[in-house]
Amino acid sequence: MSPIQPDLVDVWIFRTRADRPPTAGEPIEILLLRRAKDDAILPGLWQGVSGGLDDGENAGAAALRELAEETGFGPHQIECFYHLDQVNQFLEPGLAGVVTAAVFAVRVAPGAEPVLSGEHDAMRWVSPEEALEVAVWPDYRESIRRILENLLDPERAAWFELKLNGERVRP
Protein backbone atom coordinates (compact mmCIF):
# COMPACT_ATOMS: atom_id res chain seq x y z
CA MET A 1 0.00 0.00 0.00
CA SER A 2 1.30 3.45 -0.90
CA PRO A 3 -0.52 6.01 1.21
CA ILE A 4 -0.97 9.50 -0.19
CA GLN A 5 0.61 12.14 2.01
CA PRO A 6 -1.76 15.08 2.69
CA ASP A 7 -0.53 18.62 2.11
CA LEU A 8 -2.11 20.02 5.28
CA VAL A 9 -3.70 19.04 8.56
CA ASP A 10 -6.75 20.62 10.16
CA VAL A 11 -7.35 20.22 13.89
CA TRP A 12 -10.66 21.06 15.55
CA ILE A 13 -10.54 21.68 19.30
CA PHE A 14 -13.44 21.13 21.66
CA ARG A 15 -14.05 20.86 25.37
CA THR A 16 -16.84 19.92 27.71
CA ARG A 17 -18.07 22.14 30.48
CA ALA A 18 -17.67 19.38 33.07
CA ASP A 19 -14.64 17.51 34.30
CA ARG A 20 -15.63 14.19 32.69
CA PRO A 21 -15.87 12.68 29.19
CA PRO A 22 -18.72 14.05 27.09
CA THR A 23 -21.98 12.24 26.56
CA ALA A 24 -24.43 12.54 23.68
CA GLY A 25 -26.50 15.67 24.05
CA GLU A 26 -24.13 17.28 26.55
CA PRO A 27 -23.09 20.82 25.69
CA ILE A 28 -19.60 21.22 24.29
CA GLU A 29 -17.66 24.27 23.16
CA ILE A 30 -15.65 24.47 19.95
CA LEU A 31 -12.65 26.76 19.64
CA LEU A 32 -12.63 29.10 16.66
CA LEU A 33 -9.48 31.01 15.74
CA ARG A 34 -9.47 34.10 13.50
CA ARG A 35 -6.63 34.35 11.01
CA ALA A 36 -4.73 37.59 11.56
CA LYS A 37 -5.95 40.49 9.46
CA ASP A 38 -2.45 40.99 8.04
CA ASP A 39 -2.08 37.30 7.13
CA ALA A 40 -1.40 36.65 3.45
CA ILE A 41 -3.74 33.63 3.38
CA LEU A 42 -7.45 34.19 4.07
CA PRO A 43 -7.14 37.07 6.59
CA GLY A 44 -10.08 37.28 9.01
CA LEU A 45 -11.25 33.68 8.42
CA TRP A 46 -12.57 31.84 11.49
CA GLN A 47 -11.19 28.31 11.56
CA GLY A 48 -9.61 25.59 13.65
CA VAL A 49 -5.88 24.91 13.63
CA SER A 50 -4.44 24.40 10.16
CA GLY A 51 -0.94 23.93 8.82
CA GLY A 52 1.45 22.03 6.62
CA LEU A 53 3.50 18.90 7.21
CA ASP A 54 7.24 19.11 7.66
CA ASP A 55 9.47 16.87 5.54
CA GLY A 56 9.17 13.25 6.69
CA GLU A 57 6.43 14.08 9.21
CA ASN A 58 3.25 12.01 9.40
CA ALA A 59 -0.16 13.66 9.57
CA GLY A 60 -0.81 12.85 13.25
CA ALA A 61 2.52 14.31 14.34
CA ALA A 62 1.90 17.40 12.20
CA ALA A 63 -1.54 17.85 13.79
CA LEU A 64 -0.09 17.82 17.31
CA ARG A 65 2.81 20.10 16.33
CA GLU A 66 0.49 22.63 14.67
CA LEU A 67 -1.84 22.45 17.68
CA ALA A 68 1.04 23.32 20.02
CA GLU A 69 2.40 26.06 17.72
CA GLU A 70 -0.94 27.81 17.18
CA THR A 71 -2.59 27.35 20.59
CA GLY A 72 0.05 26.24 23.08
CA PHE A 73 -2.00 23.11 23.83
CA GLY A 74 0.21 20.13 24.61
CA PRO A 75 -0.05 16.75 26.33
CA HIS A 76 -1.11 18.24 29.67
CA GLN A 77 -4.20 19.92 28.19
CA ILE A 78 -5.14 17.17 25.71
CA GLU A 79 -7.68 14.67 27.05
CA CYS A 80 -8.24 12.82 23.75
CA PHE A 81 -6.79 12.96 20.25
CA TYR A 82 -8.96 11.77 17.34
CA HIS A 83 -8.84 11.33 13.60
CA LEU A 84 -12.15 12.28 12.00
CA ASP A 85 -11.87 9.78 9.11
CA GLN A 86 -11.94 12.81 6.83
CA VAL A 87 -9.60 14.14 4.17
CA ASN A 88 -10.68 17.43 2.64
CA GLN A 89 -9.64 18.50 -0.81
CA PHE A 90 -9.90 21.89 -2.40
CA LEU A 91 -8.59 23.88 -5.30
CA GLU A 92 -6.55 26.84 -4.09
CA PRO A 93 -6.52 29.65 -6.67
CA GLY A 94 -3.01 30.24 -7.92
CA LEU A 95 -1.80 26.69 -7.29
CA ALA A 96 -1.43 24.11 -10.03
CA GLY A 97 -3.46 21.38 -8.35
CA VAL A 98 -5.71 20.13 -5.60
CA VAL A 99 -4.69 20.56 -1.96
CA THR A 100 -5.55 17.84 0.58
CA ALA A 101 -5.98 18.18 4.34
CA ALA A 102 -6.23 15.32 6.86
CA VAL A 103 -8.65 16.26 9.63
CA PHE A 104 -8.22 15.63 13.36
CA ALA A 105 -9.95 16.71 16.56
CA VAL A 106 -8.69 17.21 20.09
CA ARG A 107 -10.69 17.32 23.29
CA VAL A 108 -8.92 19.56 25.78
CA ALA A 109 -9.51 19.84 29.50
CA PRO A 110 -12.44 21.95 30.70
CA GLY A 111 -11.21 25.46 31.35
CA ALA A 112 -8.15 25.04 29.09
CA GLU A 113 -7.36 28.29 27.28
CA PRO A 114 -5.16 28.74 24.20
CA VAL A 115 -2.16 31.00 23.86
CA LEU A 116 -2.41 32.31 20.32
CA SER A 117 0.48 32.52 17.90
CA GLY A 118 0.88 35.46 15.53
CA GLU A 119 -1.06 33.53 12.90
CA HIS A 120 -4.34 34.33 14.67
CA ASP A 121 -5.50 37.57 16.27
CA ALA A 122 -8.63 36.41 18.08
CA MET A 123 -10.29 33.31 19.47
CA ARG A 124 -13.62 32.33 20.93
CA TRP A 125 -15.25 29.25 22.40
CA VAL A 126 -18.66 28.78 20.79
CA SER A 127 -21.52 26.32 20.75
CA PRO A 128 -21.54 23.78 17.91
CA GLU A 129 -24.54 25.61 16.45
CA GLU A 130 -22.62 28.89 16.31
CA ALA A 131 -19.55 27.13 14.90
CA LEU A 132 -21.70 25.72 12.09
CA GLU A 133 -23.03 29.22 11.34
CA VAL A 134 -19.60 30.87 11.36
CA ALA A 135 -17.76 28.18 9.36
CA VAL A 136 -17.38 29.41 5.79
CA TRP A 137 -16.24 26.24 4.06
CA PRO A 138 -18.56 23.22 3.72
CA ASP A 139 -15.72 20.90 4.80
CA TYR A 140 -15.37 22.87 8.06
CA ARG A 141 -19.07 22.34 8.75
CA GLU A 142 -18.70 18.63 7.99
CA SER A 143 -15.83 18.38 10.50
CA ILE A 144 -17.98 19.99 13.20
CA ARG A 145 -20.84 17.60 12.41
CA ARG A 146 -18.46 14.62 12.67
CA ILE A 147 -17.42 15.75 16.15
CA LEU A 148 -21.07 15.89 17.19
CA GLU A 149 -22.00 12.57 15.57
CA ASN A 150 -18.95 10.49 16.47
CA LEU A 151 -17.02 11.88 19.42
CA LEU A 152 -19.68 12.52 22.06
CA ASP A 153 -20.66 8.88 22.42
CA PRO A 154 -17.77 7.18 24.29
CA GLU A 155 -18.33 3.81 22.58
CA ARG A 156 -18.29 5.34 19.11
CA ALA A 157 -15.50 7.82 19.94
CA ALA A 158 -13.20 4.94 20.88
CA TRP A 159 -13.03 3.93 17.20
CA PHE A 160 -11.60 7.36 16.27
CA GLU A 161 -9.21 7.82 19.19
CA LEU A 162 -5.46 8.00 18.67
CA LYS A 163 -2.58 7.84 21.09
CA LEU A 164 -0.37 10.93 21.13
CA ASN A 165 2.15 8.97 19.06
CA GLY A 166 -0.49 8.67 16.31
CA GLU A 167 -1.28 4.98 16.79
CA ARG A 168 -4.87 3.84 17.08
CA VAL A 169 -6.31 3.19 20.51
CA ARG A 170 -7.99 -0.20 20.30
CA PRO A 171 -11.61 -0.08 21.54
PLM features: residue spans?
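NUDIX/MutT-family hydrolases
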Residues: 103-105, 114-147
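A generic fold-level signal
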Residues: 3-6, 25-27, 40-41, 96-99, ...
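Short, well-ordered beta-strand micro-motif
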Residues: 13-15, 34, 103-107, 125
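Short aromatic/basic micro-patch
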Residues: 47, 98, 125
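Charged phosphate-binding loop/patch that engages nucleotide di/tri-phosphates or the phosphate backbone
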Residues: 140-171
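Active-site segment of metal-dependent pyrophosphate-handling enzymes
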Residues: 27, 68, 72-112
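Conserved Nudix-box catalytic region and its N-terminal flanking loop in Nudix hydrolases
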Residues: 25-69
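Conserved N-terminal beta-strand and adjoining loop/helix that marks the start
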Residues: 1-31
